[in-house]
Amino acid sequence: GARVWAEQMGTVPVASITATKLRWLADAEPENAARVAAVALPHDWLTWKLAGGPAAGLDALATDRSDASGTGYFSTPRGEYDREILDLALRRDTSDVLLPRVLAANGEAGVTVEQGPIPAGIKLGPGCGDNAGAALGLEMGVGDVSISIGTSGVVAAVIGTPAADPTGTLAGFASATDSFLPLAVTLNGSQTLDKMRELLNVDYAEFDRLALAGTPGAGGMTLVPYYQGERTPNLPRATASLLGMTLTGTTRENLARAA
């Protein structure tokens, strides 16, 4: 069940992980699932192309533990692929399917070949996932927490041991180094602010001013920002609501603050 998934793999199956997408491929396009020779993530493919692509061979594919931990068939706690999960995802024996080498943060994924303006001989790192890259750039250490509001909303923390959450609220990912990076990710991020800013017909600076001028608690209003459904919690058909509106509390300032 979900607890075993969380403890053994670090994540529970959700629509965003690679294993789930491979199961869709196996069910919707079985002929293509049967042809799969390798499975790689976008940044793995880009690194591979820089290193020569087909000329380098599929064996040249490489990744890092942070992105691998989001596939669903890489065990974050054990630090290795689980072929049984990949078999289940593609509904076939995948012993002939190549998976990228998982490199350390300071590992070398290859060197560039000359392509247009790109010179030959530049060492290539393994890259990392977006949130792992953010944690690396912020120089986060064990115990540090970050909040990112972009296309999605992300709360990330660096911890020293693997996280296991059977509810799926936290995804037990790995960091780009040797620590772990559990994530709580919402589908609705900056678009929540953008929609309210659009309704108030103000620019970002004025929107900030309005929110700061609002009263603590936004005059009793609560915005449930499920404009596109939601992934955490898993409510794909949910819609947004603005609750607690009163004649005195419903002001431009409090609307901005509620968002």
Where are these regions (language model features)?
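Active-site core segments that coordinate phosphate-bearing ligands/cofactors
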Residues: 2-10, 16-60, 68, 72-88, ...
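Short helix-boundary/re-entrant hairpin motifs in multi-pass inner-membrane proteins
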Residues: 85, 100-102
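A short coil-to-beta-strand element that immediately follows conserved catalytic motifs
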Residues: 95-99
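Glycine-rich phosphate-binding loops at beta-strand->alpha-helix junctions
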Residues: 103-112, 189
